[in-house]
Amino acid sequence: MDLYKTIIFADFDGTITTEDTIVGSIRLFSDPKEVEEYNGKLERGEMTLSQVVRYAFEDAPSSYLPRMLEYVDQVGIRPGFQEFLEEMQKLQIPVVVISGGMRQFSQRKLEPYRKWITKLHAVELDVSGPKMKVISPYDDGNELMKKTDVMALYDYE
């Protein structure tokens, strides 16, 4: 891997996008009372983020994905994002997006910007079976995507 003098690691949900696509997509198919209950458990430390997201998605039918993608299509990208990417390219600073959300969501939203993004790391959502399955090689039991582990893959000063 290349040694970078400077590198930008950017979060996706709520940083590049104007809202969190994970939370929004969960709300599409989950009982609002259940969402509140599990959000409370997360806030009280009774469940980890990894557990809550797995619970929500792995109980959902794979057939829900098209509806989720329709929702993702409606989520905005923050103003100035393209200009930021263009400036980083001029300065020869690579931009790596690390998303704790689903690859299908981030890849879809970032498609118009791919030429400026060095790499996208995201959680995989397997929809090949009747139920969704969350796959992440960087799940540490607390987070689905332990971003510091991904950052450690890159050599930078």
Predicted regions and their residues:
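Conserved active-site and cofactor/substrate-binding residues in soluble primary-metabolism enzymes
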Residues: D20, G76, K146
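Short, surface-exposed acidic
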Residues: K33-N39, L65-M68, W116-I117
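C-terminal cap/substrate-recognition subdomain and adjoining C-terminal extension
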Residues: G80-P94, G101-E157
